[in-house]
C-alpha cells in the first residue's frame, strides 16, 4: 500500500499493560486540514473532551494514541493528563499543543500511567519514521486479533494522491456518530470552501454507523481525518468516493474481527420507507443475541428474524409482504428441504449475506455485524482479571 506523503509515525511498547505495542504517534510535516466525529456516549473519555477542543479550529498536525487504558471516568485529573500529553508531544515535535489530537482506548476507570507515558512523549520526535503507519495500526489494538488498514489512490491535479486509513475495534461497538478509533490520513487537498466535516460524516453514516458487534457504544469513539495537501488537489467527488470505500473496508474488518466472531454478516435492508426505518430494523436484527447465535450454530431459525423485525414497535411491517433471504435462499416459511440448504449455507460460509425486504418503500441500506460465540463470553467475563 502507498503511504501518503509527509506523514511520519511510530508504534511502540511502553508497558502500559503487557509487552504488546501500546503507544503511537502520527505526525505531518505541515499542518493539515482536519475534522473528526466522536462518540455520543454520555460519559466521553478525557481524550474525546480535549480532542473536540483541539479539532474545532479545523487544523491538526499530530495524533497521539495509547491503548490498554481509555482514560475514561477519571475525572478532572484525566482531562489534565490528556492536556499534558498533548503539551509534551507538542514540545517534542515543535508544534502547538492544540495541533495534537489525543486518543486512548482500553479499560475504563483506571488512571493513566503518566510516569511511563510522558517519557515516551518526550522522545516522540526521535522515534518518528516516514510512513510506518502499520506500526500505529498495531499499537492501537486492544482485544483486536489483527491490524485493520485500507487505502486508495486518487487522481489529483498534479498526479496522484493517497488516502490511508487505520482502525481498531472488536468489542463495545455500536456507533452512534463515529465508532472505535479510526485515523484517516491523506496527502491531497480539496477545493477551497469544501466542508470536510460533512464529507467525513457522510462516509461514517454509510459505514461505521451501520456496524454493530455487541450493541455497546464506546466512551472513546473517534474517527479523525487529516489532509496535508502535499500531492495536490482532488475533486470532492473522487475524494468522497474513496473515503467511503475505505470506511466500509474498515467497517467490515472490524465486524470480521468481532470478539470471538467466526462469521461476518452483511445485512441488506431494502424496500424501507425511510433511512431511519432501515437503521432501526437493521440494528434490531444484528443486535439480537438469538439471531447472532443461530447464525453461529448454523440454525436457520427464521422465527428469530421475524421477532427481530417485529420488536421495532414504532415501525410495524406487514407480515405478508416481508421477505427474508440468506444468500439467495428464502427463509420465511421455509420447507424442510430449504431449511437443510439454509443450514448448510450458514455452516459452510464465513461471510453471510442476509437480505430483508420490507416492501413498504424504496430505501435500501447495508449493515455489518458478526455472530455471537462462546469466546465472546470468555473474552469479556474476565477482561480486567
From Swiss-Prot:
Picking any one GO molecular function of the record gives: L-glutamate N-acetyltransferase activity
Task: Give one GO biological process term.
Answer: L-arginine biosynthetic process
Keywords for this protein: Acyltransferase, Amino-acid biosynthesis, Arginine biosynthesis, Autocatalytic cleavage, Cytoplasm, Multifunctional enzyme, Transferase
Q: Which reaction does it catalyse?
A: N(2)-acetyl-L-ornithine + L-glutamate = N-acetyl-L-glutamate + L-ornithine; L-glutamate + acetyl-CoA = N-acetyl-L-glutamate + CoA + H(+)
Query: Which amino acid positions bind substrate, per UniProt?
Result: 142, 168, 179, 259, 380, 385
Q: Where is this site: Involved in the stabilization of negative charge on the oxyanion by the formation of the oxyanion hole?
A: 105-106
The record's EC number reads 2.3.1.35, 2.3.1.1
Tell me a GO cellular component: cytoplasm
Q: Where is the active site?
A: 179
Matching InterPro entries: Arg_biosynth_ArgJ, ArgJ-like_dom_sf, ArgJ_beta_C
Pathway annotation:
Amino-acid biosynthesis; L-arginine biosynthesis; L-ornithine and N-acetyl-L-glutamate from L-glutamate and N(2)-acetyl-L-ornithine (cyclic): step 1/1; Amino-acid biosynthesis; L-arginine biosynthesis; N(2)-acetyl-L-ornithine from L-glutamate: step 1/4
One of its Pfam families is ArgJ
Instruction: Provide the site residues for: Cleavage.
Output: 178-179
**Subcellular location per the Swiss-Prot or TrEMBL entry:** Cytoplasm
**Which EC class, in a word?**
transferase
Record's PANTHER family? ARGININE BIOSYNTHESIS BIFUNCTIONAL PROTEIN ARGJ (PTHR23100), ARGININE BIOSYNTHESIS BIFUNCTIONAL PROTEIN ARGJ, MITOCHONDRIAL (PTHR23100:SF0)
State the family named in the UniProt similarity comment for this chain.
Belongs to the ArgJ family.
NCBIfam families named among the record's database cross-references? ArgJ (TIGR00120), PRK05388.1 (NF003802)
User: What is the role of this chain?
Assistant: Catalyzes two activities which are involved in the cyclic version of arginine biosynthesis: the synthesis of N-acetylglutamate from glutamate and acetyl-CoA as the acetyl donor, and of ornithine by transacetylation between N(2)-acetylornithine and glutamate.
State whether it acts alone or in a complex, and with which partners, per the record: Heterotetramer of two alpha and two beta chains.
Q: What is this protein called?
A: Arginine biosynthesis bifunctional protein ArgJ
Q: Which organism is it from?
A: Leptospira interrogans serogroup Icterohaemorrhagiae serovar Lai (strain 56601)
- Gene that encodes it: argJ
Amino acid at each position: 500500500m502507498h503511504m501518503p506523503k509527509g506523514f511520519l509515525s511510530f508504534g511502540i511498547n511502553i508497558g502500559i499493560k503487557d509487552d504488546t505495542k501500546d503507544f503511537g504517534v502520527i505526525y505531518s510535516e505541515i499542518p493539515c486540514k482536519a475534522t473528526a466525529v466522536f462518540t455520543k456516549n454520555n460519559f466521553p473519555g478525557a481524550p474525546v473532551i480535549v480532542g473536540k477542543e483541539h479539532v474545532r479550529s479545523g487544523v491538526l498536525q499530530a495524533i497521539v494514541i495509547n491503548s490498554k487504558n481509555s482514560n475514561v471516568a477519571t475525572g478532572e485529573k484525566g482531562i489534565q493528563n490528556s492536556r499534558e500529553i498533548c503539551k509534551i508531544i507538542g514540545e517534542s515535535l515543535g508544534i502547538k499543543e492544540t495541533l495534537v489530537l489525543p486518543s486512548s482506548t482500553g479499560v475504563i476507570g483506571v488512571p493513566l500511567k503518566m510516569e511511563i507515558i510522558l517519557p515516551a512523549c518526550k522522545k516522540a520526535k526521535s522515534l518518528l519514521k516516514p510512513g510506518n503507519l502499520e506500526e500505529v495500526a498495531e499499537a492501537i489494538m486492544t482485544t483486536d486479533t489483527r491490524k485493520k488498514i485500507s487505502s486508495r489512490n486518487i487522481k489529483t491535479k498534479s498526479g496522484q494522491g493517497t488516502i490511508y486509513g487505520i482502525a481498531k475495534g472488536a468489542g463495545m461497538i455500536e456507533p452512534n456518530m463515529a465508532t472505535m478509533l479510526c485515523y484517516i490520513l491523506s496527502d491531497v487537498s480539496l477545493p477551497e470552501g469544501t466542508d470536510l466535516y460533512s464529507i467525513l460524516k457522510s462516509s461514517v453514516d454509510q459505514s461505521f454507523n451501520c456496524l454493530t458487534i455487541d450493541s455497546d457504544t464506546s466512551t472513546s469513539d473517534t474517527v479523525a481525518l487529516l489532509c496535508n495537501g502535499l500531492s495536490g488537489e482532488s475533486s470532492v467527488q473522487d475524494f468522497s468516493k474513496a473515503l467511503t470505500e475505505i470506511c466500509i473496508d474498515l467497517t467490515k474488518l472490524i465486524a470480521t474481527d468481532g470478539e470471538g466472531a467466526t462469521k461476518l454478516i452483511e445485512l441488506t435492508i431494502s424496500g424501507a420507507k425511510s433511512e431511519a426505518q432501515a437503521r432501526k430494523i437493521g440494528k434490531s436484527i444484528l443486535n439480537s443475541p438469538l439471531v447472532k447465535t443461530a447464525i453461529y450454530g448454523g440454525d436457520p431459525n427464521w422465527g428469530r428474524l421475524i421477532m427481530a423485525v417485529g420488536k421495532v414497535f414504532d415501525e410495524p411491517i406487514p407480515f405478508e409482504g416481508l421477505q427474508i433471504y440468506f444468500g439467495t435462499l428464502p427463509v420465511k416459511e421455509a420447507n424442510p428441504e430449504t431449511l437443510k440448504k439454509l443450514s448448510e449455507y450458514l455452516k459452510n460460509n464465513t461471510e453471510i449475506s442476509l437480505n430483508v425486504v420490507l416492501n413498504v418503500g424504496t430505501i435500501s441500506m447495508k449493515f455489518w455485524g458478526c455472530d455471537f460465540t462462546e469466546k465472546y463470553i470468555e473474552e469479556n467475563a474476565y477482561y480486567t482479571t
